[in-house]
């Protein structure tokens, strides 16, 4: 550039940008859910892994629900989920509330601990997407990891992913739409689906 020699800068190299230091993340503690859970948890499912066995598609690794609190990951059986879903001492940010409401209602509950659903938020933010999966949303929202977890690879990024999605909903001016219409509707639809299945079952039994 012609200004460089004029100001005597031709021997001066620009300072290289400092490289971002690689931070070594802690490994999550994997432990059973406490008998008396309390506080705020993030709940999601590790998707099932399928593969071929001869000509048949088989499940190589079943879907597995888990909860995250700070840097602890709790693998969840159905009984654990039921203890979380209607618990006055617990609040839950979840990804995909529909099957969780179904589990709660099947156990005589209502899923009252669920306060936010990331899958519903993803739909609201991009209604044209063909599917909504945590593994695809993490790079889309550049969600940072708080820890690593070999058994549940997405667990460490859930907190940042959910925070970024909440911020995006606020930035789009859609808090009221989400909180007052979409989120309550999810619970109602889950109840209607359950009731519809029960009605159909009774009707089939009467018809038979």
PLM segments and residue spans:
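Conserved RNase H-like, two-metal-ion catalytic cores of nucleic-acid enzymes
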Residues: 2-140
